[in-house]
Amino acid sequence: MAAGKTAKSILISCGARLAPFDIAELREIMSYDEMELDKIGDRKTALFLIMSDTDTTFNFVIAMLQSQLFNLLCDKAGDEYGGRLPVHVRVIADEFANIGQIPQFDKLIATIRSREISASIILQSQSQLKAMYKDSADTILGNCDTTLFLGGKEKTTLKEMSELLGKETIDLYNTSETRSNQKSFGLNYQKTGKQLMTEDEIA
């Protein structure tokens, strides 16, 4: 009885995952290859992947293609070119959090640089990445050597940007004055640390 329920559960899960392939047009697109992903890295090529920003039904196709692209090019670099592609491949992943999860991306982004491949991950906020990749999000961010922040209001991102900038040392002067029969003045000087930019300043 238990085995039967398990098998039924597996079939239901499989059916749900494969449901988009009930669409004839999608089956046709996936039935043959005309993109020549294996040629990218051999010659200068521009490949645009455009998806709906309101309907996520086919996002898995984009994620699957990008996963295959990274793995294919890494293998090609090692097998045919001694480790590095002859033409640099740059992936500009706008709305990265909306294309679906790329399997093993935390490991891919750590290795593609040496193969002459780079990826620019564009997000609305860092919380998007953490929602998609959970514990692997920090690994992905750690393998990005440049961060460009164009502003935003999401508190977690603002805090992380402020911490990333670090602190500066400032000179702090405190003065005191005592008013009585004999006036006295005091001056206290010390160095202290201050966030280079606070969350409010970044926003």
What kind of feature is each model-predicted range?
Residues S52, L123, G152:
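Conserved residues at beta->alpha junctions
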